[in-house]
Amino acid sequence: FLSLIPAAISAVSALADHF
């Protein structure tokens, strides 16, 4: 489960950087 956290963070960072 913890391995999903960095992926989620990078996804949110990508969305935040896109907007």
Swiss-Prot record:
GO cellular component entries: extracellular region
Positions of modified residues (Phenylalanine amide): F19
Keywords per UniProt: Amidation, Amphibian defense peptide, Antimicrobial, Secreted
Expression tissues: Expressed by the skin glands.
Keyword hit for Coiled coil: no
Compartments where found: Secreted
The protein's role, per its UniProt record: Has antimicrobial activity.
Family statement: Belongs to the frog skin active peptide (FSAP) family. Phylloseptin subfamily.
Protein name per UniProt: Phylloseptin-Az6
Organism whose genome encodes this protein: Pithecopus azureus (Orange-legged monkey tree frog)
Lineage per the UniProt record: Eukaryota, Metazoa, Chordata, Craniata, Vertebrata
